[in-house]
Amino acid sequence: MIVPRYYENLNVLHENTQPARAYYVPASCRMDDLVEHREGSDRLQLLNGKWKFQYFKSIYDVKDAFYEMGYDTGAFDEIEVPGVWQMAGYDTHQYTNIRYPFPFDPPYVPQDIPCGAYVHTFSYAKDVDAAKAFLNFEGVDSCFYVWINGEYVGYSQVSHMTGEFDVTDILKEGENTIAVLVMKWCDGSYLEDQDKFRMSGIFRDVYILKRPECAIRDYRITTSVLKEKAEVKLDLSFYQETAVKVTIEDRNGVVVAEGQAEHDGAFTFEIIQPTLWNTENPYLYTLILQSENETIVDHIAVRTIEIKDKVIYFNGQKTKFRGVNRHDSDPVTGFTVDVEKIKKDLTLMKQHNFNAIRSSHYPNAPYFYQMCDKYGFMVCDEADIEAHGPYMLYRKEDTDYNRFKKWNEKIADNPEWEAAILDRVKRMVERDKNRFCIVMWSMGNESAYGCNFEKALAWTKQYDPSRITQYESARYRNYDVTYNYENLDLYSRMYPALSEIEEYLEKDGSKPFLLVEYCHSMGNGPGDFEDYFQMIHSDDRMCGGFVWEWCDHAVAHDQAENGKTKYYYGGDHGEAIHDGNFCMDGLVYPDRTPHTGLLEYKNVYRPVRVRSFDQERGMLTLHNYMDFDDIQDFVDICYEVTQDGLSVQKGKVVGASAAPHSDCSVGLDIDVPTAGRVYLKLSYQLKKELPLVSAGHVLGFDELLLENKDGRNQTAAKWTASDVAVSDIRVEEDDAWIVLNGDGFTYRLDKRTGLFSGLQYAGREYLNHPMELNIWRAPTDNDMYIRAEWEKAHYDEAYTRAYSEQILQNKFGVMIMCHAGVVAPTVQKLIDVEIMWKIDGAGRIAAGITAVKDEELPDLPRFGIRMFLDKKLSEAAYYGMGPQESYRDKHRAASHGLFRSSVQELHEDYIMPQENGSHYDCDYVELTNQRYGMAVAAEHTFSFNASYYTQEVLTQTKHNYELTEADSTVLCIDHAQNGIGSNSCGPVVLDEYRFSENEFRFDFTLVPFVRG
């Protein structure tokens, strides 16, 4: 074999690597902007670019010493570094959540392990003032061997962590050749079973640092805040000792502390009346470490984080994490994400009210944390550890006790893995210790608990007692063993039901409660942000959480004929072991277009909320949910009064001032119209310029329904008002049909269904297909479990059959009463319905439907009617909740208004097609082509959905680019829909959002019309 089998040896994790140290970028002189532009340093030589590359399906196919000087790489391809080889067309993409993609046989991996050989030639100029050279790999999946100029340099693993080698004696002046052999898997892969696409290669930057012989090797900064000053402690270690001038400057370049250091040890500096860093004002000081031939510039902060009485305090303020779980993921470059991609993520997060990020489930590139320092995010830094696969092993006895015990004993509680687990935790802490955004060290994810994590926590707490520790998987253990949890600061949970949280707070509550993952954001959802927000803010021991997750993971291929990008998920590349579209669970699409769930989060976590509005006194009470800023310093509050969606009054709220976490009252004098649906909308706009967010950016809103004499929507009232003129409707009837002929209309009702099959008005047929009673919706990702019950009840095959009908007529119109049932093959009648149709002389159709569902059956997906309208009816105008989709539990980002949209724009294009585009709490909707249309209105609000896609097509189609349009504009008018929730990986839909009624009534009016 061409290399020693370190990749299957738990006793060899690294060879010839440097001890872990803090990340920094040195230069020959002071350079302040080396966070996002580190390539500007004259002491950092990037080796990124086009490398020679050959992919091998098996290590046994690597027969030539490709790393030797003079080896002919003419048969090699070229590949971009950094990058992953799957994105370059080699190997096969694979997405799996828990299951290992290879047999569980540690420390061994498949014998025919795929690998990639990299070769790159570069020019190197030696620097007499920086004669040392250190080769850095910031990310290689899964392990690698490296040679320079034919000479073996070393070996390393831990995919998401830096491997550094001293190559001073190997590099030569002029041309040099580096060769790297990367293995797809290694023993470390058992610890890298994260829920993501599995990709391989040199996926982060490769560079050489030029260093003086006498230079700082490592430094550590800690700060403590006293009464009117801060102490900055600097621990230094050197390769060889040298005099170092230490300077600390404030944001304006004013020196606030300085001194000298010449040897290993600790040095303390004072900052008088320091400005503390926080997420609303990320104030950084500049630290300059200047020696004879080198300068290191760092940006440091002064801040505190502590737990008192089971409550987290940041700079002395009670704090909640408004966080999100973030993977490195890009649909084109995979794991490789550069500064600009990270900055785009951080910008969107800031714009949508996040203040914290969990680096799920591995350390990010080191500059990510510098950017979080700069832009104001708290970070939970997570070790590159997930050993979830043993949870899926075969067990004869599949009980929780046995499942957790078997999971636990394989790795977490197996001393053979101690060195590997501690190595990963220590390397993370050592590299990232100077990043003040990091408030929490996480030992990893979903790896169970045992002696190895006890030791990792003990080392972390001893080394860095200034930060919080968390490890959610501590709860998965061998129940026969007593473990030590004293070094674990938080009680962390994933996706708990609200009742479970309440129980913990009531019966235990010994540690702050962290929702380390919650509100699974897969597809259309989540629908429970507001409910978790209320829980988080109900108790100071609740310290917030991290939504799962930031982005949909997908691989972008070419464009379909309809212009849509073909995004592939699990199974689309032919892989046998995969988890389908479970990777499509983000708040943004792969290209970072926001999901409606992101908008929902933003408004739920708005910085200010209305507590109450005394309309009679004109007194508004507000609560400040910010941690550090007064309302008056952070936001401008603008108000608007609307009547049936039209603006009638605007202005600015003046004098609102409330300290963090407190209330204020302020006068607001407005005129309330006597008729119409009248809403007061308050918009919270950023007052000051923030990093990444401009002044004037809207951070959220509140709306309040105001009381008046006639609160009906006046347009809806006109649509629903019956024509009292004498009508002349002729009724024709046979065994199958009832035909109504009026002045300018002919309606055809099918006696077999009790529903209309034709609506001809002003010479045009409005229905392309018969009307239906509708109980099915294309299952959302969050319906994945209840879907089985729905299909067991055959809701997806339901149709309507009528039993009897009765016609009554008077001078004002015709009434048709039908007794019908919603039925499906092989099961009992689903719903018994009584339908009453009232048709007046103007052609207006008033409907009243009384429904009784069989109590044995599961909650309904929805109930309403579905109409297949003339496709030329392509424009929608509606009064209800918009402009984005809204549901009974997912409508906090929507507001009441009069909205206009094309039918095409009403479709929310989830990559896995599903129910979408509904609008909640509507008074009316009109579908038109400007010349004629159909209006639906009601005295009691309803939901509607207008689309070119049927629910059948949405149910059956696996990708959005494969969707086929119907020949109609499909209009669904719903009495109700089941809630959205987050049950794809969370609790069931809350009771108050379930469509659990067994008896209900639905009234609405259909009005065909012609403009002009």
Label each residue range with its predicted role.
Residues 84-87, 92, 99-108, 157-159, ...:
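An acidic-aromatic loop/edge-strand motif
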Residues 1-39, 96-98, 190, 294-621, ...:
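Extended substrate-binding grooves/exosites of carbohydrate-active enzymes
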Residues 213-240, 595-635, 720-735, 849:
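Surface beta-strand/loop "capping" patches
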Residues 2-26, 31-38, 153-154, 177-210, ...:
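Glycine/proline-rich low-complexity spacer/linker segments in large multi-domain proteins
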Residues 172-175, 237-308, 678-716, 720, ...:
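Extended acidic/polar, glycine-enriched regions
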Residues 87-89, 184, 278, 669-676, ...:
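Beta-strand/loop-rich accessory regions of lumenal/periplasmic or secreted enzymes
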